[in-house]
């Protein structure tokens, strides 16, 4: 598939899209019968696809130069970081890294960056954070805010690996993990509540801060109280702090919130709408006949599948627990992960067991829909059609869910369950919205999934992005 990049500059972003503001402050009822509150909040999608190639780059300052790089050496990275990059197996910058890294490292501009899932966004901003740090100053100099503990942990691990040859000390800053009162670590990675609360209380110093990153920014800015907290923090930050927002999608209703966070001058890197493509992911749906039959169909699927690992996404914690128990009773090796009620230690153990291959199936809510990179996952099952908090079809979460396969250009399979006309209509609404046709898989054809997955696994080769 061909790639090309279009650079344009303008004095202001003239594209004004219709926005539909959603209610992010709705209350959560009982734990089991509701969606996983920690992660089911954003509104409906703009329809921006994670898997397009072409980027649209715009700047608020037309006099600021635009350029990209083709090698990591061109960036003037510190030698110890360049060594860390190559130790990670990166030979050359990916598309988003080519465009974003010069802005992060060499430009004074703030950054809003959108690119498809699995293209190296994390490596882009972690390199930028590490490169701005002065190791001789024992104080926070770069902060990354992630929406979930699992994503924060993954980012912490990437930073630790890329920075392994430096004297930079990263710190995982989340609840239930003890942190020092006087933080001397230069790079902080954590969740919104923990970081924002302690910055406001001045328990986390921002005196030497140079860079703030919001990962999965479209979700974070719509979390309860976060925009107000960020506005308060902006008044505490040094004037020269660079703010970088990254996401694979941008939901409707976030533009005004983003403008409160990212000040001029800024550069915006977005997917071109006409470049929508999800051809690397084979997408199917199966009519289970009734809601009760969904568990039986799932059992049949895992009776045939013998290759790789998979993630099963459900809508509520109660469903997650029920599906998990049924699969355990049938003798499957299964992990269970959701946001509420599980301790941080339990959550990290579940994701580690799955990443280490101790379990082959992970049952989860949308808490794991964004950002998590598990290369051996070749199948995603939407046990429940993804819905927003209003019960409407949610293309954004659909994209993020199926984005757990097809990482870094690999192939994968996404299978969605429907069981009546209403669930079918909701899934078809997502399909139409994204312009992506879904093939029907008959229950009599379930056995063919194993052959499809084996073919995909045989195609996998190590990728250097």
UniProtKB/Swiss-Prot annotation:
List the GO terms this entry assigns under cellular component, sorted alphabetically.
cytoplasmic stress granule; nucleus
Q: What stretch of residues is annotated with the motif Q motif?
A: 70-98
Keyword RNA-binding in the entry? The reply is yes
- Enzyme class comes to hydrolase
- Residues binding ATP: 115-122
From the UniProt record, list the reaction(s) this protein catalyses: ATP + H2O = ADP + phosphate + H(+)
Q: From what superkingdom does this record's organism come? A: Eukaryota
Residue ranges, annotated region (Disordered): 1-45
What the entry lists under Gene3D superfamilies is as follows: P-loop containing nucleotide triphosphate hydrolases (3.40.50.300)
Keywords, alphabetical? ATP-binding, Developmental protein, Helicase, Hydrolase, Nucleotide-binding, RNA-binding
An example GO BP is:
poly(A)+ mRNA export from nucleus
List, as start-end ranges, the regions of compositional bias called Basic and acidic residues: 1-20
Which PROSITE patterns does UniProt cross-reference here? HELICASE_ATP_BIND_1, HELICASE_CTER, Q_MOTIF
The annotated regions of Low complexity compositional bias extend over 21-34
- What residues does the Helicase ATP-binding domain cover? 102-268
Per the UniProt entry, the Enzyme Commission number(s) are: 3.6.4.13
Q: DEAD box: where is this motif?
A: 215-218
Record's function text: ATP-binding RNA helicase required for normal differentiation and development.
Similarity annotation:
Belongs to the DEAD box helicase family. DDX19/DBP5 subfamily.
Q: What is known of its domains?
A: The Q motif is unique to and characteristic of the DEAD box family of RNA helicases and controls ATP binding and hydrolysis.
Descriptive protein name: ATP-dependent RNA helicase ddx19
- Underlying gene: helC
């Amino acid at each position: 598939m061909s790639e090309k990049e279009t650079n344009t500059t303008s004095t202001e972003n003239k594209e004004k899209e219709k926005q539909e503001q959603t209610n992010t402050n709705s209350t959560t009822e009982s734990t089991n019968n509701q969606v996983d509150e920690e992660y089911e909040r954003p509104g409906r999608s703009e329809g921006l696809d994670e898997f397009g190639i072409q980027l649209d780059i715009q700047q608020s300052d037309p006099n600021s130069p635009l350029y990209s790089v083709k090698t990591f050496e061109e960036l003037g990275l510190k030698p110890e970081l360049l060594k860390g990059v190559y130790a990670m197996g990166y030979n050359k910058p990916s598309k988003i890294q080519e465009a974003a890294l010069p802005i992060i490292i060499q430009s004074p501009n703030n950054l809003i960056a959108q690119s498809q899932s699995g293209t190296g966004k994390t490596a882009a901003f972690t390199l930028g954070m590490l490169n701005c740090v002065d190791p001789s100053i024992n104080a926070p100099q770069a902060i990354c805010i992630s929406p979930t503990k699992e994503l924060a942990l993954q980012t912490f691990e990437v930073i630790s690996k890329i920075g392994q040859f430096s004297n930079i000390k990263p710190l995982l800053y989340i609840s239930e993990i003890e942190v020092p009162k006087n933080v001397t670590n230069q790079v902080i990675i954590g969740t919104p509540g923990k970081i924002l609360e302690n910055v406001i209380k001045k328990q986390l110093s921002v005196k030497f801060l140079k860079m703030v990153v919001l990962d999965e920014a479209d979700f974070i800015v719509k979390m309860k109280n976060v925009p107000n907290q960020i506005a308060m923090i902006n008044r505490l930050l040094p004037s020269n702090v660079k703010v970088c927002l990254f996401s694979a999608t941008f939901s409707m209703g976030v533009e005004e919130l983003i403008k409160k966070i990212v000040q001029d001058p800024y550069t915006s890197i977005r997917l071109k709408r006409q470049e929508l493509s999800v051809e690397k992911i084979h997408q199917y749906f199966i009519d289970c006949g009734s809601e009760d039959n969904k568990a039986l169909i799932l059992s049949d699927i895992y009776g045939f599948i013998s290759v790789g690992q998979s993630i099963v996404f459900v809508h509520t914690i109660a469903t997650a627990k029920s599906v998990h128990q049924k699969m355990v009773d049938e003798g499957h090796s299964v992990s269970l992960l959701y946001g509420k009620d599980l301790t941080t230690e339990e959550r990290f153990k579940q994701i580690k067991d799955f990443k280490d291959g101790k379990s082959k199936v992970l049952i989860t809510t949308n808490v794991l829909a964004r950002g998590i990179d598990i290369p051996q996952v070749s199948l995603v099952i939407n046990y429940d059609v993804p819905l927003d908090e209003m019960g409407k079809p949610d293309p954004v979460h659909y994209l993020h869910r199926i984005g757990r396969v097809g990482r870094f250009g690999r192939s994968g399979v996404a299978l969605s369950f429907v069981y009546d006309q209403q669930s079918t209509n909701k899934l078809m609404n997502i399909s139409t919205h994204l312009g992506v046709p879904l093939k029907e898989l008959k229950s009599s054809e379930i056995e063919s999934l194993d052959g499809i997955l084996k073919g995909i696994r045989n195609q996998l080769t190590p990728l250097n992005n």
